Design a protein with these regions (language model features):
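Charged, terminal alpha-helix-loop-beta segments
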Residues: 1-243
Length: 243
């Protein structure tokens, strides 16, 4: 079991008080996923995690593994239980970047080796980079997608923030889960978290769709247009956030 291979991991804390910016952001996010089930359903459900409201979520920071004779420490690990009914559990490693930092192919391949050796279901990367197209990782040379034996899923901090804000509307004022989400949003939008404003609109699909609209040449069902429309929804949610 993947959980038996973890050493030195710490339970994710909602209010991290030490560590580098990446670790603090990871800890706050993972702890919120554990405490606010509708948020974890919205963010992790599309990655294959159980959508059962009764499923439990456990999260850790800085799990350490041995791979190829070396110790490798990742930013996080999460487990979503199966809950009730025909749902599946999900064990995932999490690696994050903040600011202008980007994942490299070598890093991701090293973490994929750990995930495969220790029977994790997938690797989740989070950064300020926005994927250029659905199912395409922003790091060139990385093969990702649900059809892979150990898929690599990428979430932008923009998507995390937009999903948190969208989930916020499900709760009435005074509800504890709402307060937790509000604090996560406040934390991530603070400049010290180094979660940047929307960027990377110059990537492949954005350019192609912009050029197509200028030529009046977009066809019905254009996948690039669909992707750009969804990403723009995220940008709009971000811009609507109180600053």
């Amino acid at each position: 079991m993947a959980t038996e291979q973890i050493s030195d991991g710490k339970r994710a804390r909602l209010i991290p008080t030490e560590g580098r910016a990446e670790l603090r952001a990871t800890s706050a996010l993972l702890a919120t996923l554990e405490l606010v089930r509708p948020f974890s359903i919205a963010l992790l459900g599309p990655l294959g995690a159980s959508k059962s409201k009764r499923a439990t979520v456990k999260t850790y920071t800085e799990p350490t593994f041995r791979s190829n004779g070396r110790k490798r420490r990742l930013d996080g690990w999460l487990e979503v239980g199966s809950g009730s009914g025909p749902h599946r559990s999900l064990n995932a490693l999490v690696e994050t970047k903040v600011g202008k930092n980007k994942h490299t192919v070598e890093q991701i391949n090293n973490y994929l080796t750990v995930a495969r050796e220790d029977d994790f279901d997938c690797l989740i990367t989070i950064s300020n980079e926005v994927a250029p197209a659905p199912g395409v990782h922003p790091t060139k040379g990385v093969e990702s997608g649900a059809d892979s034996k150990t898929p690599v899923y990428h979430l932008s901090w923009l998507r995390v923030l937009a999903t948190a804000r969208e989930t916020l509307s499900e709760f009435d004022q005074g509800v504890l889960e709402r307060k937790i989400l509000e604090e996560l949003i406040y934390f991530l939008e603070n400049k010290t978290a180094q979660v940047l404003s929307p960027q990377n609109m110059s990537r492949t699909d954005w350019n192609a769709v912009r050029a197509g609209t200028q030529r009046d040449g977009l066809r019905r069902g254009n996948k690039g247009a669909t992707f750009v429309a969804k990403e723009w929804d995220l940008v709009a949610l971000f811009l609507k956030s109180p600053r």
